[in-house]
Amino acid sequence: MKLYVISGLGADFKVLEKLKFPEHLEVVFLDWLLPERGETFHHYVERMAEKMDDSEPFGLLGYSFGGIMVQEIDKIKPAEKIVILGSIKSDREKSRFIKVGEITRIPKYLPENIFTEKSALAYSFIRRFFDPKNPKLMEYFTVRDPYYLKWSIEKIAEWKFKENPKVIQILADKDIVFPIKYSKPNYVIQN
């Protein structure tokens, strides 16, 4: 069975390099696409799903924003199994920080030019205080197109979704983007 995998916002698949997949799975990593100017989330999801063969059963695995994406793809091309890592199952699990972005619509009004290489480096530096075990953050963060980053943050803040019972959620107990206190994951990873 094929397992389609989508990593986190702006990340390539090095971020998932420690995962070991069963040999019976044919793992297919899907790269992020750059959104077109003014593109709706639904249209973007359709374009991401175009790369997938749904003529036979398949699974979906998404990390962080990739977890949101695979749940949306499942509406278009239903999967046998869906696993999300470090992600949320519904908009009810958004952190307060993300909810503030949703309510105020601040992400929509942020200028694109704040999503620069320097701001990515600053984020990486600050994140090390919260996640000292992850010194390779900038190695993973390879999609740095300012429009893509701004668009993605807007879509995360705007995302509305009712929980899908077939989604298996795995969260770290110290996740800073999607804190565990707002979710009831199926599995918890310590540290």
PLM regions and their residue ranges:
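Hydrophobic, aromatic-rich cap/lid helix
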Residues: 131-164
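Active-site signature of alpha/beta-hydrolase-fold catalytic machinery across serine-
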Residues: 18, 72-73
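Flexible "cap/lid" loop of the alpha/beta hydrolase fold
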Residues: 78-113, 149
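Active-site catalytic motif of lipid deacylating hydrolases and related acyltransferases
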Residues: 1-56, 90, 106-112
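Short beta-strand/loop motif that positions the catalytic acidic residue
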Residues: 169-171, 175
